[in-house]
Amino acid sequence: MDATDRGILHHLQEDGRLTNAALAERVHLSPSPTLRRLKRLERDGTIRGYRAILDRRRVGLGLTVFVEVKLTAHSQRRAEEFSAAVAEIDAVVACHIVAGMADMLLEVVVPDLPAYEQLLLETLLELPGVTDVRSNVAIRTVKEAGPLSLGQPT
């Protein structure tokens, strides 16, 4: 990946709706080589997709909870079973295997506390291998996932 590729990625992270012509202008290439580079970055998985960023509160998902999960066993099989089950839960927007006091860290987005309580009792505590759960309710989000820092754009 060279500086031009990083420039393409930088500008698309800022505005995923840029036309190829506008993107080409920003990275100082003509449209054809810009499009070839873009298609390569998509093909090789560097660009995994494009999506709209929604305001969680405006769509009725005003509560974010970070859930620390401990599993019964520290095995690849157990982590895979848990991960497969979590992937099916729409309210879980992120799941990380972590080092520390917990084995997994989930980011859960739900309408409100009663909805989280229901999810916790009926779903999360029933997942394979779960022995302990600690919930951390976000009071306010200061910074959400944003563009990855790739250095100075071209």
Please annotate each region the language model reported.
Residues 1-154:
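A compositional/biophysical signature of low hydrophobicity enriched in polar/charged and small residues
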